Amino acid sequence: MKVLGIRFCKVAKAEDAEKLAAMLGENGLGLTPNDMGPGDGFNGAVFPVDETAKDGQGSWVELWPAGENMPEMTMLQIVVDDADAWAERAKNNGVDIKGPDDAHGERIYYLDGPGGLPIAMLSKAK
C-alpha cells in the first residue's frame, strides 16, 4: 500500500479562486497550470507539481469557482495505489469512511477529518 500523491482542492467565490490561481501562476509563484481549454471567465485551474500528475496519480493544486452544485470548501485528497485496501484498513481501525464512488476514472472514498476537514482517498478505478 502506497501513497502516490497529495492534492489540495479549494472551491471558493469565483473572484477569490481566480486571484488565488493568479498568485500561484506564472506571474506569481511561477507554477504552470494545465490548459483548461477555452471558456468564458474563470473556469478553474489545476497546477500539477510533479511529472506523475499528468497521469492523474501525482500531486497538484486545484482551484474551482463555487457554484450551484459545487459549494465553497477546502478538501485534502490522498491519491493511493488501491483505495479499496486503504478504505478497508481505515474501517478496521474504526474510521468512519463513506463510499466508494466511481467518478472520472477514479475509485473514491470520503471521510471527515477532525475539525470537519473533508478528505477523499482515491485511486484509479479498476
Residue ranges, per PLM feature:
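Conserved acetyl-CoA-binding loop of GNAT-fold acetyltransferases
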Residues: 25-33, 93-96
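N-terminal beta-strand motif that seeds the catalytic metal site of vicinal oxygen chelate
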Residues: 1-22, 27, 73-76, 125-126
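Conserved short beta-strand elements that form part of the metal-binding/catalytic scaffold
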Residues: 29-71, 118-125
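A short, local hydrophobic-aromatic micro-motif
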Residues: 4-7, 32, 98
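Proline- and acidic/polar-enriched loop/turn elements at helix boundaries
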Residues: 8, 36-38, 102-103
